[in-house]
Amino acid sequence: GPSAFLRL
């Protein structure tokens, strides 16, 4: 989900 992207 979007949260996985925010972990960059």
Swiss-Prot record:
It is found in: Secreted. The keyword Secreted applies. It comes from the Eukaryota. Keywords: Amidation, Neuropeptide, Secreted. GO terms for biological process: neuropeptide signaling pathway. The keyword Secreted applies. GO terms for cellular component: extracellular region. Its main location: secreted. The modification Leucine amide is found at residue 8. FMRFamides and FMRFamide-like peptides are neuropeptides. Belongs to the FARP (FMRF amide related peptide) family. This is Extended FMRFamide-3. It comes from Hemilobophasma montaguense (Gladiator).
